[in-house]
Amino acid sequence: MNDERRSASRKPSTAAIEVTDTISGETIGRVGNLSRTGMLLICHRPLNDNALYQLRFRLPDPFGAQSEIETGVHTMWTEQASTDGYQWSGLRIISISGRSAASLDKWLEHGAG
């Protein structure tokens, strides 16, 4: 996706941040990059285009703790990854609690792990 269409710049994740679909309880992939308004999800289970999902993941903070984030997302696009069995999905965050948003902002501000 062209960066100029994004409302916030994305930060790459250097840690393996596993993402769970809260409805199914299944781990569906990991965070590729993340911003206050969206993320790139590297999926090992395909997501549907133009679909809504409820996701949960834990962000490491600089002090060794982890913050659990729950968010509602909208799939903006999907694309086959170069590795067989994987898909890239561009997700827009459409719902996030104040507490989760504060944790996400802190993670983004402190260098993203």
Where are these predicted regions, by residue range?
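N-terminal helix initiation/capping motif
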Residues: 1-34, 109-113
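C-terminal output/interaction extensions
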Residues: 13, 82-113
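Short beta-strand-centered aromatic/proline hotspots
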Residues: 29-31, 69-79
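Short, conserved beta-turn/loop elements at beta-strand boundaries and strand-helix junctions
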Residues: 36, 78-84
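Beta-strand-rich interaction surfaces with strong enrichment in secreted/lumenal proteins
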Residues: 42-45, 60
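Short, Lys/Arg- and Gly-enriched loop/turn segments at beta-strand edges
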Residues: 60-70
